[in-house]
């Protein structure tokens, strides 16, 4: 069955879940990265003032990522039995949850590994999943939920049209940290790399706007691909395709609170 995908929901450290059976492995195509899921959701539950001390919850996954073929899961398990939906897990009040959820999904899609996103997450569901009921489609009558769905649609489109996000998911050459030591600022930056393109992903998970000096070797210009803070997604920024011009690979970027941005290098 060449078109069937076998994924293992496994929280153990057993080596070789995705190695071929002929090599002593279990033969799965992918293994759910439960560590990434737990660390990421715990981070976004945390109040912004405490995120600095939890900064490396979002860097730890790359310490072990290449040990198996990991898949990043935001599955049905995370939106049932009193755990709250993905949107509800975000810190803060109603209006604060949406920009954080958008930034979370930008981080997820830029991070190496295939993605699993459970139905209802894309509309900002507030009610936990119930197999006896359909999704709460009436949420799409509300502007923030409309904008969130629009964001998820565009995020999927950007992901699918830029091989840097997926071509070398399981190749060490496909990912490189730009900056993972901004504990006080809660800023992260890394590159995704394919044979023909490079994309820089930059995140500000603090509750304040910040200017940041982004350093990318050999880069002269950056072309904006996507910002989680564009107005059509519920943010405050006007969409712009204007390229950023740097000097000696250094770019000054303005990072809104709770935001992510992708740039074609």
Residue ranges and their predicted role:
Residues 1-115, 123, 130, 167-171, ...:
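Alpha-amylase-like alpha-glycosidases and glucanotransferases acting on alpha-linked glucans and related
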């Amino acid at each position: 069955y060449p078109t069937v995908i076998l994924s293992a929901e496994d929280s153990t450290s057993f080596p070789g879940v995705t190695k071929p059976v002929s090599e002593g492995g279990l033969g799965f195509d992918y293994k759910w990265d439960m560590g990434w899921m737990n660390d990421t959701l715990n981070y976004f539950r945390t109040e912004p003032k405490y995120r600095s001390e939890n900064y490396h919850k979002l860097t730890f996954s790359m310490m072990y990522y290449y040990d198996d073929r990991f898949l990043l899961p935001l599955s049905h398990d995370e939106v049932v039995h009193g755990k709250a939906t993905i949107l509800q897990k975000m810190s803060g009040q109603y209006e604060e949850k949406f920009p954080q959820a958008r930034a979370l999904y930008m981080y997820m899609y830029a991070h190496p590994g295939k993605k699993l996103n459970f139905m209802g997450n894309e509309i900002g569901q507030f009610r936990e999943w119930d197999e006896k009921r359909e999704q709460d489609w009436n949420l799409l009558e509300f502007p923030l939920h409309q904008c969130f769905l629009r964001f998820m649609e565009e995020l999927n489109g950007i992901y699918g049209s830029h091989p840097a996000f997926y071509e070398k998911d399981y190749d060490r050459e496909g990912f490189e940290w730009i900056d993972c030591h901004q504990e006080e600022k809660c800023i992260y930056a890394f590159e995704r790399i394919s044979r023909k393109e490079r994309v820089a992903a930059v995140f500000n998970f603090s509750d304040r706007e910040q200017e940041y000096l982004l350093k990318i070797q050999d880069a002269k210009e950056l072309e904006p691909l996507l910002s989680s803070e564009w107005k059509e997604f519920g943010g405050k920024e006007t969409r712009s395709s204007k390229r950023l011009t740097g000097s000696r690979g250094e770019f000054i970027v303005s990072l809104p609170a709770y935001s992510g941005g992708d740039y074609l290098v």
